[in-house]
Amino acid sequence: MKRKWLMTSLLFLCTALALSACTVTADKPSAAETIKQSLNTMVNEPVLASSSNPNDYIAGHRDVYKAILQTGSEGLNFLLNQLESSDDNGLKEWIMALASAELLGEDNPVQDWDSGKDWLRQYNMIAADHSD
């Protein structure tokens, strides 16, 4: 009886160890990857393509936009760099500017802006004034 119990216990232990060794843990995507994927999902939504209102794209993808906001300061740095390096000034840049403003929270110095590049221009001017 003891031998049967011992063999069963060993078999169970070996099976548990084998299964845990085969388990692959997925790495959490970086802030940059999360933001790139989220922006791509939002701006390439065919159902919303007829809308010119960026808030429609955000409202249609609340969970995706929330993922951008959950990237924190690492995400903010990435968004600012992407806005700076972008040659465009469209929907994607507008969403990046809004996310940046929301990530800054009360520290967002820009209250009135017309486009993503406009927000960035004002942000950079105010930041430069504060660094003097």
Name each region found by the language model:
Residues L10-T15:
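Hydrophobic helical h-region of N-terminal Sec-dependent signal peptides
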Residues A18-A21:
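C-terminal motif of bacterial Sec signal peptides marking the signal peptidase cleavage site
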Residues T25-D132:
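Extended repeat-based scaffolds of very large eukaryotic assembly and lipid-transport proteins
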Residues M1-S9:
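Bacterial N-terminal signal peptides that target proteins for export
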